[in-house]
A protein has these predicted regions:
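Transmembrane signal-anchor helices characteristic of membrane glycosylation enzymes that use polyprenol
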Residues: 6-33, 229-240, 442
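Membrane-interface anchor segments at the N-terminal boundary of transmembrane helices
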Residues: 8, 90-94, 334-335, 343-347, ...
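Multi-pass, polyprenyl lipid-linked donor-dependent membrane glycosyltransferases
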Residues: 34-39, 94-102, 125-160, 171, ...
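Short hydrophobic/aromatic helix or loop-helix immediately within or flanking a transmembrane segment
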Residues: 42-47, 60-89, 100-101, 460
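Loop-to-helix entry region of an early transmembrane alpha helix in multi-pass inner-membrane enzymes
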Residues: 74-81, 86-105, 127, 139, ...
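Transmembrane-helix motifs of polytopic, lipid-linked glycan transferases
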Residues: 94-118, 155, 415-419
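Membrane-interface transmembrane helices that cradle and orient dolichyl/undecaprenyl
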Residues: 117, 156-174, 204-208, 473-476
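Membrane-proximal stem/loop segments at transmembrane-domain junctions that anchor or position
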Residues: 250-378
Length: 492
């Protein structure tokens, strides 16, 4: 077998291995709960009643009326509705299989882009790194936006590279990039940052094209048209929200509440004065306004006047333990948010912020982002949130630690690859490199503003990281233009 045949064999083996890994997650760790059911209900009601909203019981016995909502963008419910139409309503197993295919497409796109930038060897290594990445594969087994968002990110950067190679004019790759950016924006509101990173880089690429004698306006016309097309899908959504609710809402409200719903901010502010770990998100943040909250689940720093509690001190002796315990007791009487309870949380928050503003505005946001980046990504597995504490079985603790080490390895490969790419002078793709770096930086800046730490919010870095890692395995020969060219390079 020649080198070309071996390349195709190894690439095929990577995709098969990636398929088996994702099917294993679907078979053993599929999870349909929480936000998955929220999206599912929106899709079902949209499909069956034509109303994008949630069902509510009326005073009539057993009667359900669907009321419109705007708390979620329609991109993922649209995907679910299409799957429900094809495979049956609430057939989530079929949805997961479609997501498996989408995730494998993400692997291929990252590999193909790495091949164009760094050659065939890099393409093959990136394909294996992507196919065997358990963190992205795990999310293919749960009906959430993450898998499709990763695909749109990979497609946007791949389309950008192809568009630039084709002369940065009006061509099919311009429309591919537009579609990827637009649908990514319909999936999650913060994906507007992807367009913010990519569109200026496209302007840069259009203006920097060698030999172009057109004026600035004509040279950049494709980019302005692309920017308009990215925003077009938001027009009917914005018009619908104005017509239905009387509010201007082109995306989705950060509070995840409809107009007229009470918005309680005191608890969230208090939570931001001490929270770092995903365990706090799961055990406290998600329980507010609906479930009991246990004060024993709070770390000692939640009762201190500062970022950290003194070592060796029992929580009950800290200055804010008594008022916090009394507030928890009152809340747990009803397990529902109310203005008096929320005001007391706000008072606690203000007291803590006055005592240590640097902690609230800088130290804790950075700590939360670091936790999202480097925590073991086992949140979808039957492993305790506090995996490092007893009584977690030692085998589970060891597995979580190994997962954290693997995650760190992906980060190190990515940033080492970025430095290697820079040493190569970006190989003619400086605008693309700038867009990728901007997408990562903007996302990390956004995460600094969030209340709750969730590792899934940093999954969106992986399509970029995989391509960057490919620079460490760059071929010394010229870049191939196509995947067929990559294989042909191997036979040369």
């Amino acid at each position: 077998m020649n080198r070309r045949g071996r390349f195709r064999l190894y690439a095929g083996a990577a995709l098969v291995a990636g398929l088996l890994l994702r099917l294993w997650f679907v078979a053993h760790l599929a999870r349909v709960a929480g936000d998955s059911l929220v999206y599912g209900e929106l899709a079902k009601n949209w499909l069956q009643s034509g109303i994008y909203g949630f069902g509510h019981e009326t005073t009539s016995a057993g009667a359900i009326v669907v009321r419109p909502t705007l708390i979620r963008l329609p991109g993922y419910p649209l995907f679910l509705a299409a799957c429900f139409r094809l495979f049956g309503v609430e057939n989530y197993r079929a949805v997961l299989y479609v997501q498996v295919a989408a995730d494998l497409l993400t692997c291929w796109l990252a590999s193909a882009l790495a091949g164009r930038l760094f050659g065939g060897r890099a393409a093959l290594v990136v394909l294996w790194l992507a196919a065997l990445c358990p963190f992205t594969a795990n999310y293919a087994a749960t009906p959430l936006t993450e898998t499709l968002v990763l695909t749109t990110i990979a497609l946007a950067f791949y389309g950008f590279a192809r568009w630039q190679q084709a002369g940065a004019r009006f061509n099919r790759w311009l429309w591919v990039t537009c579609a990827a950016l637009a649908y990514s924006l319909l999936l999650r509101p913060e994906q507007s940052l992807l367009a913010v990173a990519v569109v200026p880089a496209m302007l840069w690429a259009a203006l920097a094209m060698p030999g172009r004698r057109m004026g600035v306006l004509r040279s950049t016309a494709p980019v302005w048209v692309a920017a308009l097309c990215v925003l077009l899908p938001l027009v009917p959504w914005t018009a619908r929200n104005w017509h239905t609710f009387g509010v201007f809402e082109p995306l989705a409200p950060r509070s995840a509440s409809d107009p007229g719903d009470p918005q309680f901010h005191g608890f969230n502010r208090w939570y931001r004065t001490w929270a770092i770990e995903f365990a706090s998100t799961d055990l406290t943040y998600w329980n507010y306004d609906g479930n009991r909250m246990e004060i024993a689940k709070l770390p000692a720093r939640a009762f201190a006047l500062g970022c950290l509690a003194p070592g060796g001190v029992v929580p009950e002796s800290l200055p804010l333990y008594a008022p916090t315990a009394a507030l928890f007791d009152d809340y747990n009487q009803q397990t529902a948010a109310s203005w008096p309870v929320d005001d007391r949380f706000d008072q606690l928050a203000r007291r803590r912020i006055r005592a240590s503003p640097i902690c609230y505005y800088a130290a804790l946001p950075i700590a939360r982002v670091l936790n999202m980046m480097f925590r073991p990504r086992v949140e979808l597995m039957p492993i305790p949130d506090t995996w490092w504490k007893s009584p977690t079985p030692p085998r589970q603790t060891a597995f979580a630690a190994a997962y954290a080490a693997l995650n760190l390895a992906y980060f190190l490969l990515a940033f080492a690859g970025l430095l290697a790419w820079r040493r190569r002078g970006w190989a003619g793709f400086g605008a693309l490199a700038g867009a990728m770096a901007a997408a990562v930086a903007l996302r990390l800046l956004l995460l600094l503003t969030l209340d709750n730490s969730e590792p899934r919010y940093t999954l969106e870095l992986f399509p970029v990281f995989l391509v960057w890692a490919g620079a460490l395995f760059a071929s010394p020969s010229a870049r191939p233009a196509t995947w067929a060219g990559i294989a042909a390079e191997q036979s040369g």
